[in-house]
From Swiss-Prot:
GO BP, sorted A to Z: rRNA methylation
Cross-referenced Pfam families: PabTrmU54_TRAM_dom, tRNA_U5-meth_tr
Residue positions binding [4Fe-4S] cluster: C61, C67, C70, C137
Active-site residue list: C365
Record-linked InterPro entries: MeTrfase_TrmA_AS (IPR030390), MeTrfase_TrmA_CS (IPR030391), NA-bd_OB-fold (IPR012340), RUMT_ARLMC_TRAM_dom (IPR048845), SAM-dependent_MTases_sf (IPR029063), U5_MeTrfase_fam (IPR010280)
EC number: 2.1.1.189
CDD domains per record: AdoMet_MTases
Binding site for S-adenosyl-L-methionine: Q251, Y277, E298, D339
Name of this chain's protein: 23S rRNA (uracil(747)-C(5))-methyltransferase
Reactions catalysed: uridine(747) in 23S rRNA + S-adenosyl-L-methionine = 5-methyluridine(747) in 23S rRNA + S-adenosyl-L-homocysteine + H(+)
Role according to the record: Catalyzes the formation of 5-methyl-uridine at position equivalent to 747 (m5U747) in 23S rRNA.
Amino acid sequence: MRGIIEDLSQDGLGVINGIEVPFCYPGDEVRITRTRDRFGRKMASEFSLITPSPLRQRPRCRHYGKCGGCLWQGMKYEEQLKFKKELFRRITGIEAEILGSPRIWEFRNISNFIVSVNGIGLKEFARPKTVVDLKECPVFSNRTPLYIRAMKEFLRESGLKPWNWKEGDVHYLQVREGKFTGEVMVNIIAHRPPEETILEYFPFADSVYWSIKRDKRDDPSGEPIHLGEKEFISEKIFGIKYLLRPGIFFQTNSYALPLLLKAVEGFLDGSKVLDLYSGIGTFSLYLTKKGFNVVGVEINKTAVEVAKLSAELNSLNVEFKAKRAEEENIEGYDALILDPPRKGLGEFAGVVEKKGPENVVYVSCNPKRFILDFKNYLSRSYKVEDAILIDMFPHTPHVEAVIKLRKYS
């Protein structure tokens, strides 16, 4: 079959006659020779690009087209922003301005490299058990080859075995960089006790951890053991030092984070704010510095401990509670910030709908879940007053949305 890509799917794949084509964009002329089913839809598994779309740019990464990390790296950045805005509108029905990332290369502050028998890197697109053996990663760091080379040397000389999807010793190499501090944290995620010799292979790291993984799930989780150098590294945003360590979440784009913080601040009314799913205090610390009276609530006890340490380090008076969002009394506040995980609020949205304050700011990287929460629950009491999109994820279809909700009079 031969034809021209006419649109993009909600997941950012090119579409022609109902067939999804990865790494292709509207205006591309393609020839499809084989398809397969993926998530109940037809996807081209073998195809060739005949005539490129004018939307295209030369991708910077040699792994583009295989690695699943950057589906849109072959598209001009200004076009990426237009499509993100359009896809958000299609999914939610909301028109929103979009702010691009100040940097679109080497912006990611963390990467989880799979340590596999096939190499060290990221998953191949649509092939979850095939790892692309990375030689570079321009969206993460120009030091990526250094990190991967050090890991390979350690494996070779220690005799430890990489993960083969069923067994092995070492599963992930997690590297975190403080983009504004220059600090580096290395976290080895393994299915065995730590090897102290690992420190010899990462002399450039400001902090080294070894996390023991006791399950076979394909995620970079484990029980962290601090091996050497500093216990924390930090990132500095608006003069605030955010402490970072394994087992916590921090927004992955340090350069676009100031835009996100300002967007949330701009949508808040009043001064007494409840920050649910507050993590390490990303919003709470900034807003406290700006004069708001903030209470942060987070289920992850490690994240709460780190948030408290960061507050102390920055001389900020903010209260953090280690509990489920559902357990907190949300009444008596001027504004409520909701920044739930990708799965959204679920039934807790019903509690917000009944007891939430006049002003709610919902932060979401998953517009499909936001609109479910809104339509099923929040829309009974709230209307969308404003929204803004922040591109935290250049070269992917993903976008961070900040939505201001107002209670009906």
